[in-house]
C-alpha cells in the first residue's frame, strides 16, 4: 500500500534536511508531499534539492494558511491509500513507515506511533496531557499518526479554523465516526523540543488557546475531565509553568477571539 507522508512546514531550514534524510530511506512504496506554508528562510531551497534528487518521491507545494488548510491541501495532492503525518522538526526512525503500514494492513484505520522528545532533558520528560473520549486518548499528536484515506474523506480532514489542537479535533471526529485509534510503540518519531524559553512558552500559550477552541466546538469533551489528574502526575517547575501559560492562552482566546464558527453552537447547547 502506498503511504503518502504529508508535511506542513514553515521556516524549518535548520531541521528539514534531517527529516527528509530520514524519510527517503523508508520502506516503500512511499511519497513525501511537502507543503510549505510560506517560509521566509531557506526551507524551500533545501526541499527543492530533495525534489531534484528524488524525483517522484519528494514533491513540494506552496500553500499559505493555517496548519489545517495547508495540510488539507497536501492531502488533496497525495496519492496514497494511507496518509501519514509528521513535523518539520522531527526525525523518523528507519522502520517508521513499515510499522505504520503494518498496523493499517492489520485492519486498523488510524494509527498513532511513539513520539520521543529530544532536547533539554527537563523538557524531554514533560508528559502529554491526556484527553479521553470513549476510552480513547485523543491527545496523540499529528507528528506521528497515519490515517486510511477513507477516514479523512469521511470526517472531512482537518478543521481549518483551529490555530492549534487541530490534530486533537481530527482524532475526536475520527473516533466519533466509529474509527478506533491504535497505538503502535514501534512506529517511532523523534521530536525536537523547543530550543528557547520564548518558544517553549509560546507553544504552551497557543496550546492553551487550542484547548479553548476545542471547548467551543466540543464542549462535551470536558464533561468527565478531572483537572486534578495533572497535579497527581509528576509536577515539576516546567510542567507547572507550562500549565500556567497554557491557562493564560485558554483565557486569552476566550476573552479576545472566541467569536469563531462554533461560539453560537455552544451557546445554543447550554
Residue ranges and their predicted role:
Residues 36-45, 90:
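A conserved acidic beta->alpha catalytic loop
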Residues 198, 202-270:
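Non-catalytic, C-terminal membrane-associated alpha-helical segments of glycosyltransferases
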Residues 94-123:
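Conserved donor NDP-sugar-binding/catalytic core segment of glycosyltransferases
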Residues 62-78, 139:
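Glycine-rich, basic loop-to-helix element that forms the pyrophosphate-binding segment
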Residues 83:
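Short aromatic/hydrophobic "clamp" motif used to bind/position activated sugar donors
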Residues 21-30:
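Short, acidic, metal-binding catalytic loop of nucleotide-sugar glycosyltransferases
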Residues 144-145, 151-156, 161-188:
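A short, conserved alpha-helix in the catalytic core of glycosyltransferases
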Residues 117-118, 130-147, 163, 169:
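A recurrent flexible, glycine/aromatic-enriched loop bordering the glycosyltransferase active site
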Amino acid at each position: 500500500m502506498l503511504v503518502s507522508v504529508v508535511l506542513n512546514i514553515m521556516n524549518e531550514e535548520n531541521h528539514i534536511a534531517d527529516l527528509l534524510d530520514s524519510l527517503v530511506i523508508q520502506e516503500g512504496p512511499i511519497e513525501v508531499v511537502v507543503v510549505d506554508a510560506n517560509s521566509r528562510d531557506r526551507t524551500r531551497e533545501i526541499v527543492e534539492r530533495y525534489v531534484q534528487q528524488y524525483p517522484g518521491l519528494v514533491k513540494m507545494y506552496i500553500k499559505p494558511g493555517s496548519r489545517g488548510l495547508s495540510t488539507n491541501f497536501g492531502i488533496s495532492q497525495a496519492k496514497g491509500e494511507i496518509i501519514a503525518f509528521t513535523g518539520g522538526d522531527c526525525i523518523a526512525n528507519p522502520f517508521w513507515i513499515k510499522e505504520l503500514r503494518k498496523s493499517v494492513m492489520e485492519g486498523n484505520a488510524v494509527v498513532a506511533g511513539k513520539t520521543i522528545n529530544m532536547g533539554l532533558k527537563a523538557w524531554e520528560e514533560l508528559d502529554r496531557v491526556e484527553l479521553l473520549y470513549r476510552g480513547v486518548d485523543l491527545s496523540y499528536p499529528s507528528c506521528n499518526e497515519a490515517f486510511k484515506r477513507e477516514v479523512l474523506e469521511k470526517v472531512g480532514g482537518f478543521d481549518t479554523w483551529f490555530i492549534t489542537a487541530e490534530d486533537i479535533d481530527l482524532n475526536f471526529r475520527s473516533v466519533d465516526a466509529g474509527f478506533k485509534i491504535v497505538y503502535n510503540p514501534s512506529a517511532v518519531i523523534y521530536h525536537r523540543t523547543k530550543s528557547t524559553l520564548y518558544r517553549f512558552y509560546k507553544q504552551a500559550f497557543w496550546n492553551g488557546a487550542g484547548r479553548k477552541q476545542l471547548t467551543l466546538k466540543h464542549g462535551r469533551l470536558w464533561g468527565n475531565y478531572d483537572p486534578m489528574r495533572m497535579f497527581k502526575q509528576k509536577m515539576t517547575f516546567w510542567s507547572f509553568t507550562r500549565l500556567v501559560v497554557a491557562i493564560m492562552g485558554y483565557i486569552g482566546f476566550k476573552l479576545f477571539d472566541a467569536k469563531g464558527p462554533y461560539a453560537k453552537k455552544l451557546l445554543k447547547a447550554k
